[in-house]
Amino acid sequence: MSTMMQCVLYLAILVVLAIPLGAYIKNVMSGEKTFLSKVLTPCENLIYKVMRVDREEQMTWKKYAVSVMIFSGIGLVFLFLLQLLQGVLPGNPQNLSGVKWDLAFNTSASFITNTNWQAYSGESTLSYLTQALGLTVQNFVSAATGIAVLFALIRGFIKVKSSGLGSFWVDLTRIVVHILLPLNLVISLLLVGGGVIQNLKSAETVSLVEPIAVSAEGEILEDAVIDLDTETVTVDGEIVSDAQIVTEQFVPMGPAASQVAIKQTGTNGGGYMGVNSAHPLENPNAFTNLIEMISILLIPAALCFTFGSAVKNKRQGIAIFMAMFLCLVVALGCIAVTEQAGTSQLAQNGAVNMSMAEQAGGNMEGKETRFGIAASSTWAAFTTAASNGSVNSMHDSYTPLAGMVTMLLMQLGEVIFGGVGCGLYGMLAFAILAVFIAGLMVGRTPEFLGKKIEPYEMKWSVLVCLATPIAILVGSGLAAVVPSVMDSLHNGGAHGFSEMLYTYSSCGGNNGSAFAGFNGNTVFLNVSLGLVMLFARFLPIIGTLAIAGSLAGKKKIATTAGTLSTTNGMFVFLLIVVVLLIGALSFFPALALGPLAEFFGSIA
């Protein structure tokens, strides 16, 4: 099957699964019965009783925001302490020591913000207890927090002259119990059936099928002749005295499948293994790759249809979905085409395989041969369009233009589907901007879903839309003038700048993926990236809730012949233009110094 046909198939499967899931989520959040209600509703009610939650409470937007901040703050402190103390806690068969304070802060900020940036390798840094009780729990609740904030905004559109947006605690409970837990239970079982590990055994050491020789610098010696009896290594007839013979391999174990499932569906992205879903024990074959890849965008895509049903305007949900979907298709096409073509330099270095019957060719540097160009390119587009960040190939090895597209998808504010909940409420902020601009053009008061858009909503919408660019540009600008950051770059020149820009784009966009050549585990980078993640997560949440509170207090306006349609192709086009203009105007100078300079340098 050709690369493009595979990409089309992946997109088709995504749409087919997203529509029914969207209907299910709408029923759950509106309190309607579902096919799982008989089993899950008693569990939900028990949680309310134990935690003394008033399920009828209607919080103001400020109280809702305070609840979100307190809940996230408690999660930050708990996860921080859990990492510091893991060396003296149970569930640590490898006897791993506690994590350094700066890395613990970075990881805590990363996981409570749904970013899941990882400046460490999970299998060699964190205990099973920390992975399960710390990271996996945050994968669930950080995803649920984003969806809860989205539904607060939806209620703002629905309600009339009201100050209540529902209860954060009720929303959080329903999302976890009725949506995330059952969905991830099914996906976990599919992954285990496909070969992803799920156990509590300590790591194992196994014998290699064939020994290898490495130099003193740790590089594999090609064409080496190994004599195990005399323990000597010869290359081209000469003995390499400082070479080491490797006959065993460290194989990590642990509860990977359960964490992989929620890392994908919750757009978290933090891998159980250091190389994420490129690891054969985390993503062993084409079947698990399909499950994990579709899971990335499943809930973000479904929420578009949920939104349309909830506001009783399904065409509006479809319009928002189409704006996101068209951007994704174009981005995926650009990545797939440029990766399939490669570059002349990569061809000279032997990284571009020639097309033949057994394989499709293309830039295979940094990619797994079991996946190839199509699955790797599709995953790259999905994971950066969503604020997921998991990878099955190394983005640092992509061609300059493909790397720029992945970077731009994050820099747009993670609104091309984006994270669960946060992607859609971010896109709705852009929709408010688009409606305001269109209203100015025709000389009418801007309206959206029957509510007037006034200066108060505009100010907060601008803040929501600009939070990501501010976090990325300020963070990367400061890092560029700190001398120690240069030591973290694997490459110099334009590509080195791209590594740094990608890092801050990933953290500022709450994505978490990385150009693997960048070493982010330093005190300055751990602290600065942690602050960027917190800023880019919670400022838009506060802005979204402020907009929701204002809209809920307004009356509905009757639709007239002069009302701007927000469900037709023209509005979809306008929305895409607004998103791209803000992204282009904000980031073009930075992109010109990085991936664009590298691209033009490669063809000069």
Question: Can you annotate each of these PLM segments?
Answer:
Residues 287-318, 325-326, 387-459, 535-536:
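Long hydrophobic segments that form regular secondary structure
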Residues 68-82, 174-197, 296-299, 308, ...:
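Selective recognition of specific alpha-helical transmembrane segments in multi-pass small-molecule
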Residues 8-13, 69-73, 133-144, 153, ...:
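Hydrophobic alpha-helical transmembrane segments of multi-pass membrane proteins
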Residues 158-181, 302-326, 441-462, 555-568:
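Hydrophobic, small-residue-rich membrane helices and short re-entrant helix-turn-helix hairpins
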Residues 16-23, 75-80, 135-160, 294-313, ...:
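Transmembrane alpha-helical segments in integral membrane proteins
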Residues 429-433, 438-442, 459-485, 489-490, ...:
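C-terminal catalytic subdomain
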Residues 1-106, 151, 158-162, 166, ...:
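N-terminal alpha-helical transmembrane segments of multi-pass membrane transport
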Residues 90-135, 198-294, 347-422, 486-535, ...:
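P-loop potassium selectivity filter motif centered on the GYG triad
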